[in-house]
């Protein structure tokens, strides 16, 4: 063991700001490769998708940190699963596949290329990260499944795989501390549910396409509201532009 000498250590907030700006620029440049058409993720928060195309929201420090970690971890996951050498950022949420029948671009995080009765076009995978300390319940994972279900619908698959990388999972073996741990889940639905979800997708795509074309208040208001955790003055830079009905101006959403 080496004994450290006396050191002067001072936090440098200017350097931190510079790092955020550098990361923000890199993320913006990477985003230029994204397919400009409607993406699977646009369907989760349709109003946000509309307003972001009219007034691009600049990333703040929080968003920059979250997107950066997510993009890097997805790149490592994709590279490892595809058994590639080095690190590949290709197809990390850029919309690598266009589905004409649904009218969306999408890029599932990985795909098990097997063909079966339940999965005629392969089994799609979705990777999510979580900083939760406690084990998550099925109810907790609802927000993780929305995008996976879009991939399953596009692939006409009755089965999908959800992988959650728990960054702060407790070390139950040692009884103390935390370390990143995988949780893997198989997700299934019926043919009826698959077809119903496809119709939901088509309906939302139709509404978003029309709103983007007409830009009228009437058509914008026809778009489904965004997920609650993505909405609100503190969570969305378009809050005062969107003014979502039943939320804007109410006590709960101030």
What are these model-predicted stretches?
Residues 114-116, 129, 191, 240:
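Non-catalytic surface loops within mature trypsin-like serine protease
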Residues 84, 113, 131, 154, ...:
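Mid-sequence acidic-hydrophobic segments that form the walls
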Residues 108, 149, 234:
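Residue-level detector of short, conserved catalytic/binding motifs and their immediate flanks
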Residues 128-144:
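Covalent nucleotidyltransferase core used to form phosphodiester bonds in nucleic acids
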Residues 75-84, 139-168:
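Metal-dependent nuclease catalytic cores in nucleic-acid-processing enzymes
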Residues 138, 156-254:
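Metal-dependent nuclease catalytic regions and adjoining charged, substrate-binding loops involved
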